Amino acid sequence: MAHRPRWTLSQVTELFEKPLLDLLFEAQQVHRQHFDPRQVQVSTLLSIKTGACPEDCKYCPQSSRYKTGLEAERLMEVEQVLESARKAKAAGSTRFCMGAAWKNPHERDMPYLEQMVQGVKAMGLEACMTLGTLSESQAQRLANAGLDYYNHNLDTSPEFYGNIITTRTYQERLDTLEKVRDAGIKVCSGGIVGLGETVKDRAGLLLQLANLPTPPESVPINMLVKVEGTPLADNDDVDAFDFIRTIAVARIMMPTSYVRLSAGREQMNEQTQAMCFMAGANSIFYGCKLLTTPNPEEDKDLQLFRKLGLNPQQTAVLAGDNEQQQRLEQALMTPDTDEYYNAAAL
């Protein structure tokens, strides 16, 4: 295998300092070398356990430390989760992600989590989970159950991280990514723009991700959704061009990764989203909610896809599953419900 050179902070900083249109042009060229620019991967994520999280992530309404009005819910029954997965597949999603507001999963819950993964896989969907910190044995059990992706975000740079989270170290996050990778599960890891970080911190986040032994297969880039009751509720809004620039740099640095528009899409107009796709974003969460924050309605996504000439990507998981793209084009026009908590996984 050819040696992959490591990025330096000065190189990443130079990318962030490029004139925006030059940066977009470079990012789109890189994107076209590795992906069909008209294809966008579509995921649905269900909150299988909501709220009452012991962590203190300052952006998160699911933390038990903040009064956000979020009603906590226990771990869903396996069949409830699988019924939601069936509906997601019928609506055209090709990947079903399951998120739980935990610091880490308890051993008593592992059999139920394994059954969820097995059931989702049996439908011909890709399976993804975000459950917090994992032990080696837990990662291996999920891998044996058939889990395709595990999400565990780094959130920001190592230098700024302590300003946002104190209940879990940066190294713990890196260790979980290593355990997931060693178990044979694909890695999904990204971060959040708008935490109060500097451009240098955004560069530092992408540097950490790109310089992992193997970069994440999926890189969600979130725009902070400010929730009343959280410590970051009064943060300044993120400039759209700054967000687009972050997408473009991520694409250039991780040319074969899927770069996902995640939380914050509800705050973006069509023009901003279009420029994000131009910058190399090629994955979205689809549906009405991102765990506990709004996401554009499904029919709006389809309308935007049509305006831009984009198509939902087909994913061959099991034979006979390629009709999902047609189902998406039909089902996206039906009214949305509040059943899904689709999210930039935390």
Swiss-Prot record:
[4Fe-4S] cluster binds at C53, C57, C60. Residues 38-256 form the Radical SAM core domain. Its EC number is 2.8.1.6. Gene3D superfamilies: Aldolase class I (3.20.20.70). Its cofactor is [4Fe-4S] cluster; [2Fe-2S] cluster. One of its GO terms (molecular function) is iron ion binding. Pathway: Cofactor biosynthesis; biotin biosynthesis; biotin from 7,8-diaminononanoate: step 2/2. Disulfide bonds: none annotated. Binds 1 [4Fe-4S] cluster. The cluster is coordinated with 3 cysteines and an exchangeable S-adenosyl-L-methionine. Binds 1 [2Fe-2S] cluster. The cluster is coordinated with 3 cysteines and 1 arginine. GO terms for biological process: biotin biosynthetic process. It comes from the Bacteria. InterPro entries: Aldolase_TIM (IPR013785), BATS_dom (IPR010722), Biotin_synth/BioAB (IPR002684), Biotin_synthase (IPR024177), Elp3/MiaA/NifB-like_rSAM (IPR006638), rSAM (IPR007197). Keywords: 2Fe-2S, 4Fe-4S, Biotin biosynthesis, Iron, Iron-sulfur, Metal-binding, S-adenosyl-L-methionine, Transferase. [2Fe-2S] cluster binds at C97, C128, C188, R260. Pfam families: BATS (PF06968), Radical_SAM (PF04055). It is an enzyme of class 2 (transferase). The keyword RNA-binding does not apply. NCBIfam families: bioB (TIGR00433). Belongs to the radical SAM superfamily. Biotin synthase family. HAMAP family: BioB. Catalyzes the conversion of dethiobiotin (DTB) to biotin by the insertion of a sulfur atom into dethiobiotin via a radical-based mechanism. Homodimer. This is Biotin synthase. The gene is bioB.
